[in-house]
């Protein structure tokens, strides 16, 4: 899927908004891609996940043991990436301000993890979620994101596939 085709998916879902937006990172933007809205259609979410999965090198796709995403925004795209890759998908959540594994989710020692987000701006939530995964024994091999709001400047310490 080309960038234009991805934007067409956002437009079709009325999820490409124009105006003035204050982002959760504190930054301002003239445009806002509402990922929750574009992902509410399961067929569209599946197409976008397949396109995102296709950006990963084949050897990376084959090495992944588990997809992990931070709640809330990453849950749907993380699940769909798991489906696209044929891998299990779980999420970490922040009930008290720091990410943790809950709901009986576990990570096997040394498991190769693909972190998946809906949107990355500063990368802070990704890095915090990665700390939780590493503390549980996982090895983050890459991150994929539906939207890169950093303009290509974010450094997550692992290969990044927006």
Language-model segments: which ranges?
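PRPP-associated nucleotide enzymes
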Residues: 1-116, 120-162
């Amino acid at each position: 899927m080309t960038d234009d085709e991805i934007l067409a998916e956002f437009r079709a879902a009325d999820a490409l908004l124009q105006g003035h937006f204050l982002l959760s990172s504190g930054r301002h933007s003239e445009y806002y891609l509402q990922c929750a809205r574009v992902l509410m259609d399961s067929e569209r979410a599946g197409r976008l996940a397949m396109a995102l999965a296709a950006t990963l090198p084949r050897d990376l796709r084959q090495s992944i043991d588990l997809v992990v995403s931070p709640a809330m925004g990453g849950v749907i795209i993380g699940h769909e990436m798991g489906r696209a890759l044929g891998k299990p998908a779980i999420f970490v959540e922040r009930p008290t301000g720091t990410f943790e594994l809950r709901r009986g989710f576990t990570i096997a020692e040394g498991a190769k993890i693909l972190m998946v987000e809906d949107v990355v701006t500063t990368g802070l939530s990704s890095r915090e979620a990665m700390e939780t995964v590493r503390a549980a024994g996982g090895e983050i091999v890459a991150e994929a994101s539906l939207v890169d709001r950093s303009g290509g400047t974010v450094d997550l310490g692992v290969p990044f596939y927006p």
